[in-house]
Design a protein with these regions (language model features):
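Membrane-interfacial alpha-helical segments at the cytosolic side of multi-pass membrane proteins
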Residues: 71-87, 132-148
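Interfacial helix-loop-helix junctions of multi-pass membrane proteins
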Residues: 107-131
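Membrane-interface elements of multi-pass transporters and channels
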Residues: 24-28, 84-88, 92, 116-120, ...
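"…centered on the first transmembrane helix and the immediately adjacent amphipathic helix/loop
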Residues: 1-75
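Membrane-interfacial, low-structure loops and terminal tails that flank and connect transmembrane helices
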Residues: 149-169
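Membrane-helix interface segments
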Residues: 3-6, 88-98, 120-124
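Small-polar-interrupted transmembrane alpha-helices in polytopic inner-membrane proteins
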Residues: 13-18, 96-114
Length: 169
């Protein structure tokens, strides 16, 4: 399999996973979020929580957990997307912008999809949060790519200097 095909399959698979999570009804989605909060707090506190404590922790953490999930999910999508686009062209500003646009369009389609799922809603603020996550993922990939390129350049310079020193001896 070529690199392009593997990266394309990763992007499509990640988008499918986002779609599956978005297709959960409001009740199922709430149970998953609440379960993550309760299990995490019981693990951290090293004890079982009372029902009152569970409700308290859920009320404190449900928004950060759910919005954090958006950021992480779209961070990964952005990272995968720019990695895929790199296979089709040289990296320049247009490639980064195109990756961001594709992630935003997918986020919008995801929120429209959620609008039609029972107990869910499509939220503009979630598109904004998804966009932040995508931009962070794309930036992270770009930063790593730039560091790899700099390392390659430094290695070439070192090799040239070694040759010059060797030739001068």
């Amino acid at each position: 399999m070529t690199k392009k095909l593997i990266k394309l399959l990763l992007v499509v698979a990640w988008m499918a996973l986002i779609f599956v999570f978005s297709h959960d009804t409001g009740e199922v989605s709430t149970k998953k979020s609440d379960g993550i909060i309760i299990n995490t707090m019981e693990f951290l506190l090293e004890r079982d929580l009372t029902d009152a404590e569970k409700e308290k922790w859920i009320s404190y953490l449900v928004v950060p957990v759910r919005k954090g999930a958006h950021i992480i999910t779209y961070f990964i999508l952005g990272y995968l997307m720019i990695s895929l686009l790199k296979e089709f062209r040289l990296i320049d500003k247009r490639t980064f912008i195109f990756a961001i646009i594709l992630c935003i369009l997918y986020s919008i389609s995801d929120e429209v999809h959620q609008y039609f799922v029972p107990g869910r809603s499509g939220e503009v603020v979630d598109v904004a949060i998804d966009t932040i996550g995508s931009c962070l993922g794309i930036w992270n990939w770009g930063y790593k790519w730039k560091m790899r390129e700099r390392r390659k350049e430094l290695n070439l310079l070192r090799q040239r200097r070694k040759k010059q020193v060797k030739n001068n001896e």
